Amino acid sequence: MCGIIGYSGPRPAAEVLLKGLERLEYRGYDSAGIAVVTDKAYIESVKKSGKLNVLKTCLERRTTPIVGSTGIGHTRWATHGEPSDRNAHPHMDTEQSLAIVHNGIIENSDVLKRELLASGKSFTSETDTEVVAHLLSDAFKKTQDLVQAFVEVTQRLEGAFAVVAIHKDQPNTIVAAKNNSPLLLGFGQGENFLASDIAAFAEYTQRVANIDQERIVALSGDSVYITDFAGHPVDYEVHTVSWHPASVDSSGWSSFMLKEIFEEPQAVENTLKGRTEDGTVILPECDHIRDDLLAIDRVVLVGCGTAAYAAMTASYSIEAWAGLPVSVELSHEFRYREPVLNSKTLAVFISQSGETMDSLMAVRYARQAGVKTISVCNVMDSSIPKESHAVIYTKAGPEVAVASTKSFVCQIVVLYLLALYLGQLRGFRSIFPRQKAVCELNRLPVKLKQVLEIYESVRQLAHWMSDSRSILFLGRHAGYPIALEAALKLKELAYIHAEGFAAGELKHGPIALIEPGQPVFVIVPSPVGSPILHAKVISNIREIKSRGARIIAIAAEGDSAVLPHTDSVLRIPLTRYSFEPLLSIVPLQIFALELAADKGFDVDRPRNLAKSVTVE
């Protein structure tokens, strides 16, 4: 991991590569580098650990610029070896005739490395990538063709990978191999691109082709050639995407994350658009599996991190509105515990990027078990949608900040829609309550805008609490996963201890953490929507308040019962009980962002995190 860019064409390659790497920064990284085949037919490579600016400064200080029109670039997120200059990509062979960049993990790299060491090869890094560089170099010496070298080497590699290479003896050519790691082509006028993300080349073209699994690609400025791993030519399809570089511009905002939080009302509106009519839900994406959905008797929701919490949040609504039992699984645990699955199981996979490797592997596992699969993703034409029976896209737009915000709320909205759709198909409950739910669902964009009006109050609260070393979050019912997500956001951004608990679990252990001054956020259900749960949560608040905790409540407008027992109250508009979690998370997202910003941290690119986790 984490970001790849390749370019061949008339432009100065180094400039194109650096711009591409800038667009890939949001994916998270710890080092960066480029390699270019120069006009004098040798490869020049520069790589540095740290931020991209370190690499730029190094290039600016050179007495002679790197001149060449074909090259590759990489931002690295360490998986093998510490973040350092020597472990940064690109990596080269011993003769400095070949350079490669690589995303993924070569699972048998230790075995291959021992073979290479025994043959006299030496290594300058700790990475699995350098192993591939030596293998390709040896294969090229035999074949004198980089595509054929890849055909030979890919037979020996185990794991998920995207490897991209240049060779001084084929100066205008880039060759790449893809196996379960994101890689796509961009087609320009007399120039072509390779990248792990369209953001890397969207400034130049929106004509793209997705590369299938187990493919080798050779490109120059005026040609593209694709084979399978056996070297047999294969066809590909070019299409135009609607994606503008301005969508990843944070001008006028202090951070992408803040911009994206304020985009949530529009993102939810876009996600709902065209999917409801006269109180019913319309999901044409699922029409072709309608009969299968009528036959299901249970639902499994699968995701990682924030996506898993979106699944947990919506699971209550699926059970209530569709009358189906629901379980929520972590993608990386799902296929290793022999889950009981059959043809009457519906598995729904949630992933912002559509490339989360754990979730992709889980999709394949489910399909092999005869399960019908639906994916909920934000990135069009990504791997998980292509391998699912159906996909319902969130329409959040590009999300640049590593910590997910608008995608999270849109994932929940899509799952609400799916819950109502399944209820319609099954004739579960009467039409009237369902129509009321759809009507209130369509009011959420306006109510999200109202929540954003308390931004300044939340910012001041974060400043007041910036010295906190531990913060707890409590919720009940669908407020519980919101507590988990709020704690995750604080850990991701502010690097402090935070935990989310089901409020009813307090007396079973967590109450031991409460001491005078301990900050505790409590997500309070509305007394209108659920008076019983509201009373229970007020009881929980009183328990911890009596032990000296500092209570901050997220509560609906008009709820006066919280006032005597809390230190602060952040108000959300009154809405249907099922939808309260969607509004409750917004001030908690803002709080995490502002607390981290107050500490001086980069809220868009938190340490050690990647936007798209494409390795297991």
Curated annotation (Swiss-Prot):
User: What Pfam families does the annotation carry?
Assistant: GATase_6, SIS
Tell where it localizes: Cytoplasm
Annotated region Disordered: the residues are 70-89
Instruction: State the signal peptide span.
Output: none
Keywords associated with the record: Aminotransferase, Cytoplasm, Glutamine amidotransferase, Repeat, Transferase
Please report the stretch or stretches of sequence annotated as the SIS domain.
289-428, 461-606
Q: Where is the Glutamine amidotransferase type-2 domain?
A: 2-222
Q: What is its EC number?
A: 2.6.1.16
Keyword Calcium set for record = no
Task: Supply one GO BP term.
Answer: protein N-linked glycosylation
Q: GO molecular function terms here?
A: carbohydrate derivative binding; glutamine-fructose-6-phosphate transaminase (isomerizing) activity
Q: Which SUPFAM superfamilies match?
A: N-terminal nucleophile aminohydrolases (Ntn hydrolases) (SSF56235), SIS domain (SSF53697)
Q: Which reaction does it catalyse?
A: D-fructose 6-phosphate + L-glutamine = D-glucosamine 6-phosphate + L-glutamate
Q: Which GO terms describe its cellular component?
A: cytosol
Tell me how this protein assembles: Homodimer.
What's its job? Catalyzes the first step in hexosamine metabolism, converting fructose-6P into glucosamine-6P using glutamine as a nitrogen source.
Question: HAMAP family given for it?
Answer: GlmS
Q: What is this protein called?
A: Glutamine--fructose-6-phosphate aminotransferase [isomerizing]
* Gene that produces this protein: glmS
